[in-house]
Amino acid sequence: MDVNPTLLFLKVPAQNAISTTFPYTGDPPYSHGTGTGYTMDTVNRTHQYSERGKWTINTETGAPQLNPIDGPLPEDNEPTGYAQTDCVLEAMAFLEKSHPGIFENSCLETMEVVQQTRVDKLTQGRQTFDWTLNRNQPAATALANTIEVFRLNGLTTSESGRLIDFLKDVMESMEKEEMEIVTHFQRKRRVRDNMTKKMVTQRTIGKKKQKLNRRGYLIRALTLNTMTKDAERGKLKRRAIATPGMQIRGFVYFVETLARSICEKLEQSGLPVGGNEKKAKLANVVRKMMTNSQDTELSFTITGDNTKWNENQNPRMFLAMITYITRNQPEWFRNVLSVAPIMFSNKMARLGKGYMFESKNMKLRTQIPAEMLSSIDLRYFNDSTRRKIEKIRPLLIEGAASLSPGMMMGMFNMLSTVLGVSILNLGQKEYTKTSYWWDGLQSSDDFALIVNAPNHEGIQAGVDRFYRTCKLLGINMSKKKSYINRTGTFEFTSFFYRYGFVANFSMELPSFGVSGINESADMSIGVTVIKNNMINNDLGPATAQMALQLFIKDYRYTYRCHRGDTQIQTRRSFEIKKLWDQTRSKAGLLVSDGGPNLYNIRNLHIPEVCLKWELMDKDYQGRLCNPLNPFVSHKEIESVNNAVVMPSHGPAKTMEYDAVATTHSWVPKRNRSILNTSQRGILEDEQMYQKCCNLFEKFFPSSSYRRPVGISSMVEAMVSRARIDARIDFESGRIKKEDFAEIMKICSTIEDLRRQK
């Protein structure tokens, strides 16, 4: 029977159908090729917004820098980055007046964090610009390379393991006249392929030492690498995002810790909370404005959009904010926090890979690296690219563009939120000193503004005043993209409010389905996603039941594990049928072994193994979960695992799911093809770290693992632990005297080897 799709909406209030207009089904668009063009756009736009600022030359790197701070006041509605220092400081002062002690308390909290944070905090995060190799690396590898190079240059403070000590090394490294680095190089040789008899290029990787003078090192330390942001839905054009290097990361972390601590205390801040907590915060602000607007008052809400938030923010302004926020704090603390904005106001944006060229008859392809853009003849480029390059040329130094104004995406989300909230805070009646007043919400660059006034003129005046106040702080509310409604209907960070929040279910669509980790994890994640959506997103029981059936079907097709009594033929069906026939209690078989599905919407919280345990044959139990079975992977499994699910907006979320180690929790092996590429050296480094960490964890199982205090190395810690454990085992009779003696001997040998080294 054909269903007329409009029937679906007959009983649905219009606002609930918002889901259907979102571009979230199907694959998101990915970028291909280089991000060089997008990065040049960002750099050129940022300078254009601040073009009436003052130009100076950086004495250390020779980079031309534009400073728009305290620039001309706006005469029109075009976006500009001319924030006024005194206005920002005054906004901060008012924020503190409204929240007595907020800065003081946040500073104390942050100081504690600064003293306790370990350097391994920097291993979190994905891609990081590795300044030693001049390209992106996984964060852990980039950090290790940095520390290795620091040690090579006699900077060893960071060996204490505290992040603050690593930052001391960073500061010291910038004072050095030259830095010696270990970098990779490629050798290319032309050799004849035995199979095809064609000539092929063979690459090998070596490590070499290289010296950087102070200027060269500073340029690298201040460089942000750029990439194209992938998987952005609902946009025609791609845009560039930045990955900072290890020198900047630690300083940014502490600034953001302070800002996060402030945001937590501000009722108008949409960060750092999320989900239902954020909705509750929002609903509170709306309630406050609705109840306070008595019958005599009108209340309107702007669903706000700011033009190019990041490109008009300015690190110098952030420096002023931090200077104010920390004004009564110890000198060392103020210094640590001011490094990040100072580094950002001297930053360089790496232009990425450069341009690919193809000759018309397609015989030749060549890549023009970014370093060559400053000297290459422009006649090879089309008009728009030519204009971009001409504009950016004066700013280029060694393939990176000097970019003093602007913030690059996602670097200071919390601190910029504090700036936004400080304007919302000025809307109280005691500050506006007139009949209109405002309040709202701010989450990074997204905002919702609620204005109350006795009449429409008052509303208009309130909005105008808000708009102008924003301009003074370098924030440009877009008049084209913001829209105003009677309070009760608005959108904020993709939450739709219509007398209460409307579930925007389409946003969760990308996380339904089979994740592709392994059979065990996928089953668990799949049912957890359905469970979470029943709790948070108005997924009704009937729809949830249907989602579950679709998921099981999808799962069976993905892993070719149709029920043992099915007629569907797959590569696995022969084995599965055999298992089915020899199993007495067929209900006990896992779905991934061809068993029936016992899930329904009431028992989604129970891992499948636990759900079916009582129903399993004894010998099946013995194979499935036996730690001695070589196919049961216990390496990666803790009682709660984290999966990365992709919601439609915002970063990938981690989601907890229960995991039970079985023969189905395998970990796939790494793709072999990487071993033949230039990454091979890096892969070997990574495996070495992996091995060291695994070994360390063997000695310190998670139950007894306390962060090592003091400055003993990993080896010393493991040796002393081995001695203690051996003694306990020997005294309790778990090991024989000979074993005990041998363990002690090995420990001594290791210590001797360390001393000789």
Swiss-Prot record:
Residue ranges of every copy of the RdRp catalytic domain listed in the record: 286-483
Xref: InterPro entries: RNA-dir_pol_NSvirus, RNA_pol_PB1_influenza
Pfam families: Flu_PB1
Keyword set, alphabetical order: Eukaryotic host gene expression shutoff by virus, Eukaryotic host transcription shutoff by virus, Host cytoplasm, Host gene expression shutoff by virus, Host nucleus, Host-virus interaction, Inhibition of host RNA polymerase II by virus, Nucleotide-binding, Nucleotidyltransferase, Phosphoprotein, RNA-directed RNA polymerase, Transferase, Viral RNA replication, Viral transcription
Post-translational modification: Phosphorylated by host PRKCA.
Compartments where located: Host nucleus; Host cytoplasm
GO biological process, one term: DNA-templated transcription
Cellular component, GO annotation: host cell cytoplasm; host cell nucleus
Database matches in Gene3D superfamilies: 6.10.140.720
Assembly description: Influenza RNA polymerase is composed of three subunits: PB1, PB2 and PA. Interacts (via N-terminus) with PA (via C-terminus). Interacts (via C-terminus) with PB2 (via N-terminus); this interaction is essential for transcription initiation. Interacts (via C-terminus) with human PKP2 (via N-terminus); the interaction competitively inhibits the interaction between the RNA polymerase subunits PB1 and PB2.
HAMAP family named among the record's database cross-references: INFV_RDRP (MF_04065)
Physiological role: RNA-dependent RNA polymerase which is responsible for replication and transcription of virus RNA segments. The transcription of viral mRNAs occurs by a unique mechanism called cap-snatching. 5' methylated caps of cellular mRNAs are cleaved after 10-13 nucleotides by PA. In turn, these short capped RNAs are used as primers by PB1 for transcription of viral mRNAs. During virus replication, PB1 initiates RNA synthesis and copy vRNA into complementary RNA (cRNA) which in turn serves as a template for the production of more vRNAs.
Family: Belongs to the influenza viruses polymerase PB1 family.
Protein name per Swiss-Prot or TrEMBL: RNA-directed RNA polymerase catalytic subunit
Gene that encodes it: PB1
